[in-house]
From Swiss-Prot:
Gene behind the chain: ytbQ
GO molecular function, one term: dTDP-glucose 4,6-dehydratase activity
Protein name (record): Uncharacterized protein YtbQ
Domain of life: Bacteria
Short name of one Pfam family: Epimerase
Similarity-based family: Belongs to the NAD(P)-dependent epimerase/dehydratase family.
InterPro entries registered for this protein in UniProt: Epimerase_deHydtase, Lipid_A_modif_metabolic_enz, NAD(P)-bd_dom_sf
Length: 253
């Protein structure tokens, strides 16, 4: 059974993955705070390299970088910039470097659709077609810029250290999908459902592709991003989309 380390496992995505992957993998969660789920828990600050290097198990097969921090979208806030760069720049580099130094073969990075959010409004592509990873990355906020920076850090480690890196530009993942679908129209197009979240991360862990960037969104009607490469290259198999979720609710399933 492969050993998977989830860095930043106390967030929404981390908890969903820790619970969903544990039947197929030996899962360990690394976070500043103790993880109280079924997976093993390691407390460490990912922005402290020496601490990270000591605490990551050397026999880890894959690291999932889900590190996150609450953010404000204020380009003029220096304190906010420094907080974000600690997580989305410094810690991203540290995780890649630790993986390379410890001989860990794979890192899956939870990137964001905000890397290209200039091309999307209210869940609709402004390009007249689905947005692809070939489109030049342009973001409306520092969060998207730093997520792209982390993707590029991973690419450098792939080139220089042969670290396998898969970047997943994630759509919308929430704990309560139905409430959010009723409250936010955009989510009907941008949701990555819980089954599809597990499906694409499993595909990223298991793929033989050494490096790639993919959009991670369910096969929702009118979705703004293309999942063609994720399906064809990673073997991503979407299980349920927003139309099906809403239909199940309507029919009382």
């Amino acid at each position: 059974m492969k050993k998977v380390l989830i860095a930043g496992g106390n967030g929404v995505i981390g908890r969903l993955l820790a619970e969903g992957l544990i039947s197929d993998y030996e899962v360990t969660v690394l976070d500043k705070d103790h993880f109280d789920g079924k997976a093993s828990s390691i407390q460490a600050d990912a922005a402290n390299y020496e601490e990270l290097l000591k605490k990551i198990p050397k026999d880890t097969d894959a690291i999932l970088n889900l590190l996150a921090v609450k953010i404000k979208y204020d380009i003029m806030d220096i304190a906010e910039f420094e907080k974000m760069t600690d997580v989305f720049y410094r810690a991203s580099y540290y995780l890649c470097r630790a993986a390379a130094e410890l001989g860990i073969q794979k890192l899956v990075f939870a990137s964001s659709n905000h890397v290209t959010d200039v091309y999307e409004k209210d869940g609709r592509s402004l390009l007249g077609r689905e947005i692809t990873t070939s489109d030049y990355p342009l973001s409306k906020n520092l969060y998207g810029v730093l997520k792209l920076t982390s993707e590029q850090i991973g690419h450098l480690f792939y080139l220089e250290n042969k670290l396998s890196v898969i970047n997943l530009r994630i759509g919308t993942v929430v704990t309560d999908e139905m409430d959010t679908l009723h409250e936010k129209e955009r989510t009907k197009k941008t949701l990555l459902s819980h089954p599809d979240l597990l499906s694409i991360f499993k595909a990223a862990i298991e793929t033989n592709i050494r490096y790639g960037t993919y959009y991670a969104v369910s096969d929702n009607p009118g979705r703004p991003w293309s999942i063609e490469s994720a399906v064809n290259e990673l073997g991503f198999s979407p299980q349920i989309n927003t139309a099906e979720l809403l239909n199940e609710e309507e029919n009382g399933a």
